[in-house]
């Protein structure tokens, strides 16, 4: 693993110290996040929001890959992909390639159900195609999602269990067996009231309307009902997260373990919903450690 220069390491430590002194991040702090420009911007569809940003580390590779999926309550109101460049740049500096995914949200044409799920399929198919052009190690992938993006990456892990009759079925999905959900809201059925309270989103927007052909709208959209999926999931939540409180992580982990999957809950002391996703937050070293552990680049924390 490449070591950070002493000056850069000192700068990172000072940033973390000042961030802790300033207290938990707020929404305005999150919206102000920024990071470096990507190595490439690659369209995976014709719509304006159907693209991903590729961040390549220095060196020859092949590089492990972090797929980043932003949150924002499934809307374009709260930014998203631009804010995740902050994390993307920090990961690339650690030798991890990043595939930062934009997608159609509920307030965009074609977004919501089924569009945003089909966008996840298309974005991962495009990543697979990029492996033929860039030194990417697709045997080492972690999907990292924040908030609404946590729902989508946890859904990604269960894609192989989607019934063949579903509009969301993919015959050969790219396997993603390591998931890091940062303040995710993945259980669409079980957390429907919280999702409505935190984000103002209802079931129809996120899971579609029931029909004779599809009576249970959660059978192909709810990550909690696509278990077991053979993945290992880290559910990372700020102690002070009010959008997706720690209880949500513990409840999902219990369901995953009961189904036979491996799930670990990581609570970030003193952290908010927005500290979970910022490389400039005092919580970042622990989040980074989880991501590197998911990629088998770091040992488990005692």
Name these PLM-found stretches.
Residues 125-194:
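Primarily recognizes the serine-hydrolase "nucleophile elbow" in alpha/beta-hydrolase
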Residues 271-281:
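Catalytic histidine-centered segment of alpha/beta-hydrolase-like enzymes
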Residues 235-237, 241:
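Short beta-strand/loop motif that positions the catalytic acidic residue
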Residues 111-132:
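Alpha/beta-hydrolase active-site loop
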Residues 26-37, 47, 158, 190-225:
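Mobile cap/lid helix-loop segments that gate and shape the active-site cleft of serine hydrolases
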